[in-house]
Each structure stands twice: as structure tokens, then as C-alpha cells.
Amino acid sequence: VEPAETLELQCALAWPPVTGRWLGTWWFRAAGGFTGRANTALAIGDPGVPVTEALERVCEFAHSHGLEPAVQAVQHGPVERALAARGWVPNVAHEAGHEVSVLVGPLGGPAETARILGEPTPGWWELCAGTTEPSEAQRHVLTTAPALGYGVVEAGTETVGAVRAAVVDDVLHVSRLAVAPAYRRKGLAADLMAAAGAWAGARGATRCALQVSVANAPALALYHRLGFTEHHRYRYWVPATPACEDRSP
């Protein structure tokens, strides 16, 4: 089984922050608060300094970007144990869910009606980001990974399904899968996944990965039907006050 941290890094590279800084193999990320993944420190491997010092650097970076300090760590891994020993706690208040399942599965394909575009359309933005006028942070995170495709299903002039696809190494990273309410339960989500899989296979991908909150039962059920299984989980951790004071000027 591939180490969880390798897959974590591949998923993170598919979701680039506006600003990033490396400390050893830890990656500090900031993107104006748009998504937990792009605004936390991905703590994998060795930061190259003692963990206590690394966490101080996490705090300094977050505060300098107007963020609350937070770490993304593989569940039950050595980093979590180090965090707990230093007074950090799982961020149970995280709006989208602090515990996330990383699923892996087959590419699938071909699609029936879904297609992959080279540029996002207004309809894609509306479904995937909830707006046709994305913020600078939304646009950066969602459109600057190296190999990107924007999946859509259209009914006339209306975009009724959308998904984001990114290829990193041999992994297709799928995100922002959305279907308009009136068009759900018609197989569009599966068709979007198939289109993404066929597109990614032509670009060297051999498998698919995605990240889903463990609280999102409908999404987990869909992906399990499509042959996905859980590879590992990660959690968001935050310092218990006053372990991480804001020292920024």
C-alpha cells in the first residue's frame, strides 16, 4: 500500500494555495480562507527542525496571512501523536468537517453526455464555486494546478453538472463534483466521473483519488458504488489556547 503521506502530497499539489512555504517536507499554505486544504499546514514527513519549533513556524505563517493556525495530518500517524503531545486538538468546529476520508478507485469511463473542457465556463463556476465571479483565491486554487480539466453536463444552455479534474503524477484528483438539484438521481455524477477518468487516462493517470468529509454520507455512498475504497483519513488540528499566540505586528 502506498504511504498515506505520498498520496496526501499528490492531492495537495492538485489543490495549490495562493501562497506556500516549505519547511522540510511540511507545506504551509494560505489562500484567503478558501477551503481548509489550501489554508493549513500539510504536516507530512520531517520538517527538518524539532516539532515544537515547526509548530511555532506554522503559527507565525498563519498569523502573517490573517489565518487561524491549523495543521492537516494523517489520522493516527506520527504527526498526530506529536500534535497531541504538544497541546494541539482536532478542530471539531471546522465547518466542512474536521475528519476527511481519502478514497482511491478506478478511473472509469467512457462518458455518455459529460465532457471535459480546457477552461472553466460561467456555468461551471456557478456549480463548483457557487458564483460566476470567483475571488482571486478561488480562481487560483481551482485553476492553477498543472494538468486541469473542467467537466460539465449541459441541458440546452444550462450547465446542470460539473466537476474539477487534476492529474498529478499517475493520480487523477477529483473535486467539486456538483449536480443541479432538479437533475439529481439521473446518473450525471457517475457520468462526470467517467468523463474525468477517460480524460485523465489519456494524460497518464492510472487511478483516481478524492477527499470527502466523513459526514458526507451521500457522497461516500456514490463513490463506494463506483468502486472506491478508503485509503486513509486526515484531520485538521488547531492549538489549544494559549499555545499559539498571535505575535504578528
Tell what function each PLM region has.
Residues 51-59, 176-181, 185-202, 221-225:
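Conserved acetyl-CoA-binding loop-helix of GNAT-fold acetyltransferases
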Residues 8, 13-15, 61, 78, ...:
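Active-site rim helix/loop that mediates acceptor-substrate recognition in acyltransferases
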Residues 139-180:
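A conserved beta-strand-loop-helix scaffold within acyl/acetyltransferase catalytic domains
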Residues 47-123, 237-238:
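Acyl-donor-binding surface of acyltransferase catalytic domains
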